[in-house]
Amino acid sequence: MAGRVKIKQKELIDSTVKNKNVMNLFHEIIGSKGNINFSIVWPKFKKIKQSVYEYISILSVLEKASVMQNFEEDKKMLELFVQKLWAAYEGYFKYPEIEKYEVDGQVNFNLVPQYVLEKFSQLYRSRINSELVTLILNSCAFLSKYNDYILKKDPYILTITPGLCFSPIPNFEDLNFKYLYNSDKNSQHDKDFIMFILYKLYTAALGVYNAISIPDIDVEDLENIILSSVSQIKKQIPRCKDAFNKIESSVHLLRKNFNTYYSDYVGSGYNPTIIMEQYIKDISQDSKNISPRISYQFRTIIKYYRDMIATKHQTMDPQVLNLVKHVEKKLDMLDREKK
């Protein structure tokens, strides 16, 4: 049955490609124009929410722990900081409108009112890029430098490393784990507890990072769009069979390298062109299999797009233009290498 669903999905994409601009379809799949795939994005959002909750909860456990009775001033500052984090969490991650439609952790989005989906769609990206999530990701980046020690709960980083401060939370240097750990007021049990808190804080931050890194995109849909668009356009451009075959046979690169493409996409500030640029770059870098004939065919395909746009007196989408320029530049490099 699942296979039949995928076939119908591909048939729908094939039909849609005939009637829509391919780049617009690409934008829709990526979600760069506000469209999101709820079946992918909602579970991702929940994972981020859960890991953020765990991160703040761990700090709350530390604040209430008996070991902090020895550090009255630090305890007060940590209590205020945790309160601010909880307030931010409530503001960013409470979506009871969708949650009330969950049954056994699953949501039938066909039953969710459109206004609820639209509200979530509008707010989703600002939530996962919020100051709270950014703070935790920066905390993760700091702690990841000491990954091996923390995962082994090795106190080396709090005892031997140079410096007097080990503060893993940006903008909150008052939480100095090195100071807490090395205090004469602590028993060995207290020291072990502090190291355990640091370990749990890191694993929760890693949970946020791993959830953020989940693509918002169905890679198979993206592959189908590329293949369907190629099958449509190659009927209109004769004598470019080898170039089209090269594109079609290289679609596997999209799936193979997609996590890297997606990381670049997020790092670029969600510029959707990045994914296609990196994909075409990977195709064109296989210079052993790109003969002068195939290079010429690629140029013919590019010229077709340019002529089609000029005929319709349209201004080329800047993102498409950048993509075309990138391909042309790569082809020029390959031509020079073969001379």
Curated annotation (Swiss-Prot):
It comes from the Viruses. The keyword Oxidoreductase does not apply. Keywords: Host cytoplasm, Host nucleus, Host-virus interaction, Late protein. Induction: Expressed in the late phase of the viral replicative cycle. The keyword Chaperone does not apply. It is found in: Host cytoplasm; Host nucleus. GO terms for cellular component: host cell cytoplasm; host cell nucleus. Interacts with host NACA (alpha chain of nascent polypeptide-associated complex). Belongs to the asfivirus H339R family. This is Protein H339R. It comes from African swine fever virus (isolate Tick/Malawi/Lil 20-1/1983) (ASFV).
